[in-house]
Design a protein with these regions (language model features):
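Short, structured active-site "lid" loops
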Residues: 45-64, 68
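Short active-site oxyanion
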Residues: 2-3, 59-62, 81-83
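Short helix-loop-beta junction
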Residues: 20-28
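A short beta-strand-loop structural module common to alpha/beta enzyme folds
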Residues: 28-39
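Mid-chain, well-packed structural core segment of small domains
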Residues: 64-109
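Residues at secondary-structure transition points
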Residues: 9, 13, 38-41, 45, ...
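C-terminal binding/interaction regions
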Residues: 4-6, 10, 90-143
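N-terminal beta1-alpha1 ligand-phosphate binding loop
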Residues: 2-21
């Protein structure tokens, strides 16, 4: 399993903290940017990069961060097959992973979430395979 990371300037330092935590826990990741703090960067660029990477690598997840998490979630969810979810509590993470098979976790840097607990829940929670959940997930990809 691999995790693709992305963040704009408001999420940059949270992303850097996440990278350190992932490395300390021997979890493979790829940083899709921004690589340096740039107060003028744009969140859609990094959300697109993470969404494309997750779609191309079926055994992966994404983590996106911006100030509120709203912008990166909106951008990522424009991609068919991406199910990006904004979560602030571990129970929300478990619910969206199990019921919705979320594949990108969106974090609000302005709220300084307890990101280790959220990431652990995201990684550890499998998607349920019940027909009703799969039916609903399939409907997300309809036009």
């Amino acid at each position: 399993m691999k995790i693709y990371l992305g963040a704009d300037h408001r999420g940059f330092y949270l992303k850097e903290d996440i990278k350190a935590w992932l490395a300390a826990n021997a979890i493979e990741y790829i940083d899709c940017g921004n690589q340096v703090y740039d107060a003028e960067d744009d969140f859609p660029d990094f959300a697109k990069a993470v969404a494309r990477s997750v779609l191309a690598d079926s055994d992966s997840f994404g983590i996106l961060a911006c100030g509120s998490a709203q912008g990166v979630a909106m951008q990522a969810n424009r991609f068919k097959g991406i199910r990006a979810a904004i979560c602030r509590e571990a129970e929300e993470v478990r619910e969206t992973r199990s019921h919705n098979d979320a594949n990108i976790l969106c974090l609000a840097a302005d709220n300084a979430p307890d990101f280790p607990a959220l990431i652990q829940a995201f990684i550890a929670t499998p998607a349920l395979t019940d027909e009703k959940y799969q039916r609903r997930i399939n409907k997300l990809d309809e036009e």
